[in-house]
């Protein structure tokens, strides 16, 4: 009976993977604890064959995927975008209230802020103006899917400063283009 252990485990795992639609050929998966990060090429009784992005091949027993965790990127591939979530740290000592002159300068020099009006009774800070600008800039870009979440938030401050988390979805999900898009966007924010 021990001779057939891998075959039996593979068979049961294969049924679980199929019945629960956990994995299909063509899916991009990553398997923690292994070097598997690529496209599923083949699923057999005893192995799942994955072509990694560096063109190496990984083979993993199906029962490993059922008994441990793995990440299937199919949901991202089939969705309307690929998530970008990064933070920009602001020096806590540079955050200050905006004077009326500062607000007027922002409105004149930054077209996206031309129609900005703070809530009544609120004196905005330069950090708040940056968050408003980031949101308006992202919503103006055709590469950003504004039908999905777009959230600009201030996180708990750290020894590195105050993180402004920028969370949005790129319409383009192709890895190379996705990296270029997010790099271009963050280059703009850094400048």
Predicted regions and their residues:
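Soluble accessory domains appended to multi-pass membrane transport proteins
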Residues: 16-131
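Solvent-exposed, non-transmembrane alpha-helical starts
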Residues: 175-181
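Short, intrinsically disordered, charge-balanced linker/junction segments flanking boundaries
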Residues: 185-191
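Short secondary-structure junctions
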Residues: 138-149, 191
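Short edge beta-strands and adjacent turn/loop segments
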Residues: 148-164
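Hydrophobic alpha-helical transmembrane segments and their immediate juxtamembrane helical boundaries
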Residues: 1-16, 20
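Short, hydrophobic beta-strand segments
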Residues: 161-174
């Amino acid at each position: 009976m021990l001779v057939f252990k891998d075959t039996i485990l593979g068979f049961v795992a294969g049924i679980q993977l199929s019945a629960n639609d956990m994995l299909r050929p063509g899916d991009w998966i990553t398997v923690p604890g292994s070097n598997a990060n690529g496209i599923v090429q083949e699923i057999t009784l005893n192995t799942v064959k994955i072509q990694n992005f560096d063109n190496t091949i990984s083979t993993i027993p199906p029962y490993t995927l059922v008994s441990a965790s793995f990440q299937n990127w199919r949901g991202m591939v089939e969705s309307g975008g690929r998530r970008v979530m990064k933070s920009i740290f602001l020096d806590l000592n540079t955050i200050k209230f905006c004077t009326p002159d500062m607000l007027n300068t922002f409105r004149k020099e930054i077209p996206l802020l031309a129609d900005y009006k703070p809530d009544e009774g609120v004196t905005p800070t330069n950090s708040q103006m940056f968050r408003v600008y980031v949101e308006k800039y992202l919503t103006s870009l055709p590469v950003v899917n504004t039908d999905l979440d777009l959230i600009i938030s201030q996180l708990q401050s750290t020894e590195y400063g105050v993180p402004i988390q920028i969370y949005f979805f790129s319409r383009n999900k192709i890895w190379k283009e996705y990296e270029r898009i997010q790099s271009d966007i963050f280059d703009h924010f850094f400048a």
